[in-house]
Structures are given as C-alpha cells and as structure tokens.
Amino acid sequence: MANIIPILTDTQISEIEPKSEQKVYKALYKQLPNDWLVIHSLEFMKKTSQYNSHGDREADFVIFAPEYGVLVIEVKGGGVECNGQTRQWYSIDRDQNKHEIKNPLGQAKDAKYEIRNHLEQRGKRNILLAHGALFPDISNINA
C-alpha cells in the first residue's frame, strides 16, 4: 500500500466527493508500492499573468514515485466526452445532457508546472514530471 495524504478512515473515504475521486483514492492507496507517496486534493496558488494576481487551484492526485518522478492526475467522473475538432470537453449527466468542462489534461498540466516551479524554488531540479487524466466511470470508448 502506498503512503497517502491525507490518511482517511473508511467512513471518511466513503464521504469523498466526487465519488470518482473516492474510487481513485482507494485504488492508488491499495495498489501502489509502499515507498510511493500519494497526495489527494493538493491545493496551491497559481500565479496568473493578468495583473500578477494569484488564484487558488487544486490537483486531484499527485504521486511521488521514487526513481520515476512525479505524476499529476486530474479525475473526471460520470460520462465524459471530447469533441475532436473543437477540443471542447463535456461532462454528461444522468439525463444525457452535456455540460462544458475544463480540459482535464490542461488542468493536470497546469498543476504539474506549478509543482515543478515549487520544487525548483527549493533546489529540486531534474525531476521527471508527467500529467494525465483518469475517467474511472467510463466503461467503453467510442471513437
């Protein structure tokens, strides 16, 4: 089992919202090696270019894997669709209605660069970082 922050009781795990993150929390905790560190819901401030302001952001999961690097994961639950031509992402609700959402890969990518900047400011350079998205409620892919 991986080291995970925060460590939650079964009751607390069952209260994680959205439920898609609950599934991923359980899977990462149980299936990753015990020398790996998983941080769930890592909050950070992102410096924006407009007026040098800051905005709060969150990475759903950040995995620190010794000898491999750092992986930042964005989780999207329920139905998810991406229009290949416009590259617009949608969530699909129970009534099959589409709702525009942010690009989950873009969200993970932004978080990755913020984490990289944070590490570099502390002298931690040359660390391999990657990003990705998980869709735990998707059972098939229609191309």
Write out the residue ranges for each language-model feature.
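Intrinsically disordered, low-complexity Ser/Thr/Pro/Gly-rich regulatory segments
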Residues: M1-A143
